[in-house]
Amino acid sequence: MKTKIFSFAFNRPDILQYQITSLKKFIVGEYDINIVYDTRDNQYYEQFKKICDDNDVVFHHHLSEPGGTPSFYNAQAIKWVYDTVISKEDDCYVMLLDHDMFLIDELDVHQEMSVYDIIGCLQTREKVKYVWPGLCIFKKSSVEDIEFDFYPQTVDGQILDTGGGTYKLLSNEKIKFMDTGVDYPEEYKGIDLKDEKITG
């Protein structure tokens, strides 16, 4: 089954090439890369479009509604892609990424998803659980009949950030979820995007 990768960018065209290169280097199996440029002013339109064209990846242009918060803008762009692109696809794995997430090792999505419907970075607010969409993979057929969204919201008195609406997925007993977790080392040194072992 093909993996459809969607990276959501709103600034920093200078790092997009590194993300695309790392994805092409480390994703195992059949995949498509989609870059979603979410903007209100089109400041970086030409730069993002050229990088996508040069790398033969799909470019989506989303004009978000002004007056929101960064979390709302991000959720609005993800929902737009889900409704206008993903919902029309054949069954596939869908990977959602922030524009500043980079693979640093091989990732076989088909193998990782063999027994799960969703994998991603779990967010917990008291008893409410949801998935952060900056690092998330789901099987389209597993979630398409469940009503959910990616917007921040308040649930059981808890304030949920971007991806908050995915609590409906994790509270569904049919969904098998794996938390990828996030390990924070005592001293974070970052990664060198110019290191050819990482980004070619």
Locations of the language-model features?
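Conserved catalytic core of nucleotide-sugar-dependent glycosyltransferases
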Residues: 102-169
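Short beta-strand-to-loop acidic/aromatic patch adjacent to the donor-nucleotide binding site
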Residues: 91-102
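C-terminal catalytic/acceptor-binding lobe
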Residues: 160-200
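Residues at the starts of beta-strands that form the adenosine-phosphate
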Residues: 2, 30-33
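Active-site-proximal specificity loops/subdomain of glycosyltransferases
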Residues: 41-90
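Short, acidic, metal-binding catalytic loop of nucleotide-sugar glycosyltransferases
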Residues: 21-31
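N-proximal low-complexity "stem/linker" segments adjacent to membrane-targeting elements
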Residues: 1-22
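Short internal beta-strands
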Residues: 34-38
